[in-house]
Amino acid sequence: MIILGIDPGTAITGYGVIEFIGNRYKPITYSCLRTEPDLPLDLRLKKLYQGLMDIIKRYQPDCMAVEELFFNKNARTALAVGHARGIALLAGANSSIPVAEYTPLQVKQAVTGYGKAEKQQIQFMVKTLLSLPEIPKPDDVADALAVAICHAQWSSTFGGRIK
């Protein structure tokens, strides 16, 4: 199973494509999509959509996993993440890819075994589980890989959480 994990954001959207066979993870590609802060929101979202569609066409994932929006005290930040999440969900739907959504707590639990794990613990486990030479940067990339790992765990244990 090839999984595309997404950590959405309008400035930086992390993505990671992994292959999950049996109980083994294989990283295929990981990076981030960036948009210029001086661009109008509609153009930033268009650029994000085009980037995600390019990734989907190139790697042809079997499914997509997107991190759910968590409560944020900054309403502007929460709205921006919400816009980016919508674009990711749209890209998956337009590509006829099943999309699963996971809360940060579920991602932490799946990757580290502890729902209140710190960011450094998650990053270390992503590096370890994927046998990477170093922790992926920026943080959004490691988070996207963690979401993909989470989906692999949920899929193998509970049959996935496809919405």
UniProtKB/Swiss-Prot annotation:
It comes from the Bacteria. One of its GO terms (biological process) is DNA repair. The active site is at D7, E67, D140. Mg(2+) 2 binds at E67. It is found in: Cytoplasm. Keywords: Cytoplasm, DNA damage, DNA recombination, DNA repair, DNA-binding, Endonuclease, Hydrolase, Magnesium, Metal-binding, Nuclease. Its EC number is 3.1.21.10. GO terms for molecular function: crossover junction DNA endonuclease activity; DNA binding; magnesium ion binding. It catalyses: Endonucleolytic cleavage at a junction such as a reciprocal single-stranded crossover between two homologous DNA duplexes (Holliday junction). This is Crossover junction endodeoxyribonuclease RuvC. It comes from Desulforamulus reducens (strain ATCC BAA-1160 / DSM 100696 / MI-1).
